[in-house]
Amino acid sequence: MKKRTNTSKKPEADSPRARRSKEERMRFLRQNTWLVLLAVLILVAVILFICVLAGGSPQPSQTDKNEAGKTERYVAGYICADTASVAYYDAQLNEVGTVARGTQITYCTDEVLDKGGVRYYLTYFDSLRYGYLASDAITTDASKVVGETTVYVRTPQNLRIRADGPALGKLVEQGTELPVVGYDYLEDGVVHLYEVRYGGQTGYISGQYTASTLEAATEVYDRFGVYSVHAGRGDPYGGGDAGSLDYYPREKANFEDNVMPVNCYSLYLTCDPEVIGNVEKYIEYAKSTKINAFVVNIMDGTSVGYPSKAYLEYSPTAYEYANNTLEEYQAAIRKIKDAGFYCIGRLTTFNDSFFVSDHPEYAISDASGDPLYIANSYWPSAFCRYVWEYKVELAKEAVETMGFDEIQFDYVRFPDGTYQYESSGNINYHNEYDETKAQAIQRFLMYATDELHDEGVYVGADVFGETCGTYVTSYGQYWPAISNVVDVISGMPYPDHFTQNGSYRPWEHPYDTILDWATSAAKRQSETPSPAVARTWIQAYDAIRYPYNTYGAEEVGAEIQALIDGGLTGGFMTWNAACNLNKLESFRSAFDALE
């Protein structure tokens, strides 16, 4: 048998050069062992870091399983609840904050804590916030974010007939149970409008006026004694009981693309053609001072700025008597805004002879049904919701067509001087829901504010100077209740409107008169949990009472300083119905002294 031949070669002997190189490497390793170990550790750390980056980033998914049936580590979802926000916790399950329902989240399926049979997932709310969230507050179905099936009315409201329209339905009282059919959208976890069922019909109500339980809906809000202050004031003049009004805190509007000046220094302009047609002169004057805003009439009783489409539907007579064309008025407002001024549209609310001529059925009337002519005007009743719809539609159309930054409601009250009619029973307010005057005024302003906030503008209300007192006025204005609702409240404490006391004439002492008034108004501001900005009308005309004092820079400057010293720092508006440029020029030094 033939032997197998071994064809493998023996290893060749190392050359002297190779041996020296090998010895040097071994010597280096022996002398630098710690460096070698450090390099290995760094390499391992780098490899692990790369692995984390490659395999540990969130991979949002609508299911907990991937296509292979394996559980995903990171899952996208939403916060769900039957309240506007839910609590989240740290690793020891201590509550550390709240987050709004509807928030898009990513939760980690393998970072779970269990306590009392409840699972808590590590959840990322945004790039900076995270925490542990109970499993029942997490859903992957966007349609299940809102959990409530029933809500209870906290603040009486008229249901909206449609989510996208002004028409109002029935009034629902506090504590009313409303089955939820759906909703439109969320704002910071709060439902904007619930679709609810009531009286065999569906309607809409803002989530801010509801609660999830009957107990919460009927609880009296008295934090810091807010309610107690008003409950004891009663109803001395027939305008309503202060305790029956709403003082629940409201979040004031703050629009990023419509910034209200911290201090509004405002000139007033009528909608007369000679003013609208010469608006450049007022702009030129304002730009040479520290004035930063204009108040312009949309309508002032029977003085109508332009032919709004809203008039065609609600008051054709107003449309017919418009002072300017739509294009003329629009051009004037555009010039004001293009010049950089904050622009406020003023409209009178519940004194409107044109509307009454078109709709006498909604007028305050005598017992026989004839509209009453009170204080030089006919008055639509503030109890009538159709009137509310009209004024709010007019305001919204003005915002959309003209671009106003703010809408100011003047004459947002019942007429004063009605005692003789009320005492004799010869007056009909068409009070369908048996409300007080103050309730009707506050509820109108809630409705108007909600509607106009949806348009991205602020809402103001003018009130008589008398409202700085501690009572509900006979015409339904009560400062704390109004201030709690609107964005801006504007008193009208014209010194020549104050009562003379013996030989003391308040209009001869503008600083003292306004300081005393502002101090009282500031106290009313402190009596509401979410007060409005107080921007006050000042007298910018010569006194209409003996000795007919001339009001110039000294007097106007005194009024402005008194407001500040009294604690009302939201600015002012000059009331000069003539819009006299020479008169405005006389105030220049007072305006130059503004901060």
Language-model segment annotations:
Residues 100-134, 176-208:
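SH3/SH3-like beta-barrel superfamily modules
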Residues 486-500, 510-515, 520, 524-595:
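Substrate-binding cleft of secreted/luminal carbohydrate-active enzymes
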Residues 89-101, 163-174:
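SH3/SH3-like (including bacterial SH3b) beta-barrel domains
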Residues 289-324, 416-423, 584, 591:
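Aromatic-lined carbohydrate-binding/catalytic grooves of carbohydrate-active enzymes
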Residues 279-304, 401-406, 488, 563-571:
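Catalytic domains of carbohydrate-active enzymes, especially glycoside hydrolases
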Residues 342-352, 408, 437-474, 529-543:
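Aromatic-lined carbohydrate-recognition surfaces of secreted/lumenal glycan-active proteins
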Residues 63-71, 124-151, 197-250:
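Boundary regions of SH3-family modules and the immediately adjacent low-complexity/disordered segments
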Residues 253-274, 345-397:
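Active-site-adjacent "subsite" loops/lids of carbohydrate-active enzymes
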